[in-house]
């Protein structure tokens, strides 16, 4: 059962509609009891890192999620801020992250006014992926590999082996990461048309 963590943040209805079109069942989890039958987990997220972490901590689901992901090895995918929450920490806030894939969330820095003008923040719009290594998550993507982005911070994993794909916005940064059963994507698959559907369908098939 694909379960999306409903802790008050993220466009969960968009994922429900997308999976409904694929005839794949998806359920919402707003407490630990709803996680009991999870065989795959989606962790969405929008907004500020600390707010998202506090909302998840307050939901009462964090310990159960740690158990499912780290001990029972249930596949999980974090999306946008949901991916950033998988890091150890973020320059945006003070709270600790989940630490599922060691790394730090950093803010895009602009060393000159020209760069700031060319690459304004937030990074908003379409960008293509550069594949760093093969992954089942990437099956079915088209040749251009365009995805929709909206963010001002990026995830820098400690181990480059965890980088699946990168994007370029003034410099190359990780936009898809993976360690064992843990996946994270910075872009918004629910807004990325064919490629977003293909990626979420591939996650359902893991």
Swiss-Prot record:
Domain Glutamine amidotransferase type-1: 1-206
Name by which UniProt lists this protein: Imidazole glycerol phosphate synthase subunit HisH 3
Classification via CDD domains: GATase1_IGP_Synthase (cd01748)
Entry's Gene Ontology molecular function annotations: glutaminase activity; imidazoleglycerol-phosphate synthase activity; lyase activity
GO biological process: L-histidine biosynthetic process
Highest taxon listed in the record's lineage: Bacteria
Entry's EC annotation: 4.3.2.10, 3.5.1.2
Main function: IGPS catalyzes the conversion of PRFAR and glutamine to IGP, AICAR and glutamate. The HisH subunit provides the glutamine amidotransferase activity that produces the ammonia necessary to HisF for the synthesis of IGP and AICAR.
Chief location category: cytoplasm
Active site: 80 (nucleophile), 188, 190
Recorded catalytic activity of this chain's protein: 5-[(5-phospho-1-deoxy-D-ribulos-1-ylimino)methylamino]-1-(5-phospho-beta-D-ribosyl)imidazole-4-carboxamide + L-glutamine = D-erythro-1-(imidazol-4-yl)glycerol 3-phosphate + 5-amino-1-(5-phospho-beta-D-ribosyl)imidazole-4-carboxamide + L-glutamate + H(+); L-glutamine + H2O = L-glutamate + NH4(+)
């Amino acid at each position: 059962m694909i379960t999306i963590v409903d802790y008050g943040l993220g466009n969960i209805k968009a994922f429900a509609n997308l999976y409904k079109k694929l005839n794949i069942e998806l359920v919402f989890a707003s407490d630990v009891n709803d996680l009991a039958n999870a065989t795959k987990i989606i962790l969405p997220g929008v907004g500020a890192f600390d707010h998202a972490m506090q909302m998840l901590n307050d939901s009462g689901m964090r310990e159960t999620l740690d158990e499912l992901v780290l001990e029972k090895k249930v596949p999980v995918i974090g999306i946008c801020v949901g991916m950033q929450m998988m890091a150890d920490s973020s320059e945006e806030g003070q709270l600790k992250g989940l630490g599922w894939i060691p790394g730090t969330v950093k803010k895009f820095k602009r060393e000159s006014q020209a760069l700031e003008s060319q690459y304004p923040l937030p990074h908003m719009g379409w960008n293509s992926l550069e594949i760093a290594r093969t992954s089942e998550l990437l099956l079915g993507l088209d040749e251009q590999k365009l995805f929709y982005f909206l963010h001002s911070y990026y995830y820098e994993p400690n181990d480059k082996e965890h980088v699946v794909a990168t994007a370029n916005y003034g410099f190359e940064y990780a936009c898809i990461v993976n360690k064992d059963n843990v996946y994270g994507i910075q872009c918004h698959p629910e807004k990325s048309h064919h490629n977003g559907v293909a990626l979420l369908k591939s996650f359902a098939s893991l």
